[in-house]
Curated annotation (Swiss-Prot):
It holds the Pfam family MraY_sig1. The keyword Repeat does not apply. PROSITE patterns: MRAY_1, MRAY_2. It is a multi-pass membrane protein. It comes from the Bacteria. It comes from Methylobacterium radiotolerans (strain ATCC 27329 / DSM 1819 / JCM 2831 / NBRC 15690 / NCIMB 10815 / 0-1). The gene is mraY. Belongs to the glycosyltransferase 4 family. MraY subfamily. This is Phospho-N-acetylmuramoyl-pentapeptide-transferase. Catalyzes the initial step of the lipid cycle reactions in the biosynthesis of the cell wall peptidoglycan: transfers peptidoglycan precursor phospho-MurNAc-pentapeptide from UDP-MurNAc-pentapeptide onto the lipid carrier undecaprenyl phosphate, yielding undecaprenyl-pyrophosphoryl-MurNAc-pentapeptide, known as lipid I. The lineage of its organism: Bacteria, Pseudomonadati, Pseudomonadota, Alphaproteobacteria, Hyphomicrobiales. One of its GO terms (biological process) is cell wall organization.
């Protein structure tokens, strides 16, 4: 909303600062972080009282988890979403359609995750509601978002899939594009969901990916930088940098409480929402393939589950000691902090590789 103050800059010049995306991105980051840090203890106390036993812990997982994680409340994504939404509404341009599409996906996926968490906590079971029904709901939200994005995208880029590295390489997917875009968004949401299994494991790679895509959105949404880098210019997507800034700020605030030993878990409420957000930004900026690089850690986690399930059904044997793959390394003897920090390092390397594609033309 503060962006609207820039309309008064002709009367009071200092208000012109609210036009700058970089200034508002910093403001969103600071606001979201302060919000989560300030209200975090109250939210954690409330969730602990409401949930009692907290998130159910897998009996077949590392035995240390039964001792160190039992009783920890979940639904910490509420903290992240609350801080991010407040900051976005305060600092982002309310006239920007990409902001509203991204918010819709984020809150829609967050609501699905919240209900799933609610069922798990109340039933003290790892099974939420039907996986197929959950995927169907996510697909409907994602499809609606992709159709809206396509409507507002430049005519030359509608229904086009852009390839990194290759200059002007576009593939017209036609009416199949919304399906592809929905696959990206739903896949991103569930991949981040699979990654969220250890203290701090998911939130830092999410912040790294958000920082990367915030930078990409800023460059793609600026005609000068897009022309210089020879990437597709998508007008108005620069505003998504403010959204990414808000998520990073909220993520930093959440990490304060999620650092080991975690006082709260993100839960499906946060992981589905944040993954959906990343997917929708990738679709809006026409960098869907780059998301697979930047978010390669999330892809690895999801693929480990798919491979494990497929292998067991086809051969009766498991490829990994346990899936997702972060538990495989725990079963091999890695300590939880080792797994988490090494996966963070991988996330940084993949983010740098994703950014490198902007320059390779």
């Amino acid at each position: 909303m503060l962006y609207l103050l820039s309309d008064l800059s002709s009367s009071f010049t200092p208000l012109n600062v609210f036009r700058y995306i970089t200034f508002r991105t910093g403001g969103a980051l600071f606001t979201a972080g302060l919000f989560v840090f300030w209200f975090g203890p109250w939210i954690i106390s409330l969730l602990r009282i409401r949930q009692g036993k907290g998130q159910p812990i897998r009996e077949d997982g590392p035995q240390t988890h039964l001792l160190t994680k039992r009783g920890t409340p979940t639904m910490g994504g509420l903290m992240i979403l609350a801080g991010a939404v407040v900051a976005i509404l305060l600092w982002a341009n309310p006239r920007n359609h990409y902001v509203w599409v991204t918010l819709t996906v984020t809150l829609g996926f967050g609501a699905i995750g919240f209900y799933d968490d609610y069922l798990k906590v109340t039933k003290q079971s790892h099974k939420g509601f039907s996986g197929k029904f959950r995927l169907a709901l996510e697909a409907v939200i994602a499809m609606a978002a992709c159709v809206t994005i396509a409507v507002y995208s430049p005519a030359a880029l509608q229904n086009q899939l852009a390839f990194p590295v290759f200059k002007d390489a576009l593939l017209n997917l036609g009416w199949f594009y919304p399906l592809f875009g929905a696959f990206v968004i739903v896949g991103a949401g569930n991949s981040v969901n699979m990654t969220d299994g250890l203290d701090g494991l998911a939130i830092v790679p999410v912040m790294i990916a958000c920082g990367t895509f915030g930078f990409i959105a800023y460059l793609v949404g600026n005609s000068f930088t897009a022309s210089y880098l020879q990437v597709n210019y998508v007008r108005d997507t620069g505003e998504l940098a403010v959204v990414c800034g808000a998520v990073i700020g909220a993520g930093l605030g959440f990490l304060w409480f999620n650092a080991p030993p975690a006082q709260i878990f993100m839960g499906d409420t946060g992981s589905l929402a944040l993954g959906g957000l990343l997917g929708s930004i990738a679709v809006a900026t026409k960098h869907e393939i780059v998301l697979a690089i930047v978010g390669g850690l999330f892809v690895l986690e999801m693929m480990s589950v798919i491979i494990q399930v497929a292998s067991f059904k086809l051969t009766g044997k498991r490829v990994f000691r346990m899936a997702p793959i972060h538990h495989h390394f725990e079963q091999k003897g890695w300590k939880e902090p080792q797994v988490v920090i090494r996966f963070w390092i991988i996330a940084v390397i993949l983010a740098m590789a994703g950014l490198a594609t902007l320059k390779l033309r």
